[in-house]
Amino acid sequence: MNYSNNYIEHQNKKKTIIIFFRQFKKQKPMLRMGVHLVVINKNTFNFFNRQNNYFNSGKTKKIFVIDRFLAVHQIVRKKLQLVGVTALLLACKYEEVSVPVVDDLILISDKAYSRREVLDMEKLMANTLQFNFSLPTPYVFMKRFLKAAQSDKKLEILSFFMIELCLVEYEMLEYLPSKLAASAIYTAQCTLKGFEEWSKTCEFHTGYNEEQLLACARKMVAFHHKAGTGKLTGSTTHLSSFMLQEVNQLGFCFKGGKNYNKNLI
């Protein structure tokens, strides 16, 4: 028996995550763009980027933990990096086989915090989120949506690349993880194939029609364009060297735009 549709439906019911994100954008106006990247702390991505895969669930889990926590808890600016480092620890405990040593995390933060501060922040964040770390990230939906799209390696790589470009982008907080995943696949299809109609199969399994994906997809196209000019509001340095190497081999890393459907430009 195929339970995939039931699983996707269950994950989509966890709509509370969009409430966290909207609160975050409304209540934390000082955490915009560059500051948002500082909180995420791009240096801590090195832990995940050692792994040779297209996409890492721990990486997205860390960012979602940060955003959910900041949506409901006031933190002074000097403690923002501590939030990022501690979120890495929590994400690894939940998603990864290998968990970083606290002393190593202190080194990542240039010894700005003590071991006690990291452990106290871990306790605060876990209690604030009520130990609920199971809310879905785009990674949860990506594999299933790619299967529905009958993806090949090229489509898979570029879809994950589109998602990674969005990880540090403040304005993408408003979208549900399922919509980000579906939009990334739709955008990748437009890039690789000029334009291919969003199939009924994809619409059925993702729950989104083409019109519902256009706004999100257009933003992904804009990030793709800006990545090649160095004008990205966040930073592409969080992308793993493995990811960049794979996408470069496709010839699409920073070329995006020429093959897009005119509706996306």
Swiss-Prot record:
Name of the gene this protein is made from: CYCB2-5
Protein name: Cyclin-B2-5
Key word Cell division present: yes
Protein's UniProt keywords contain NAD: no
InterPro entries the UniProt entry points to: Cyclin (IPR039361), Cyclin-like_dom (IPR013763), Cyclin-like_sf (IPR036915), Cyclin_C-dom (IPR004367), Cyclin_N (IPR006671)
Keywords for this protein: Cell cycle, Cell division, Cyclin
Family membership: Belongs to the cyclin family. Cyclin AB subfamily.
Highest rank taxon of the organism: Eukaryota
Signal peptide start and end residues: none
BP GO annotations: cell division
Cited SMART domains: CYCLIN (SM00385), Cyclin_C (SM01332)
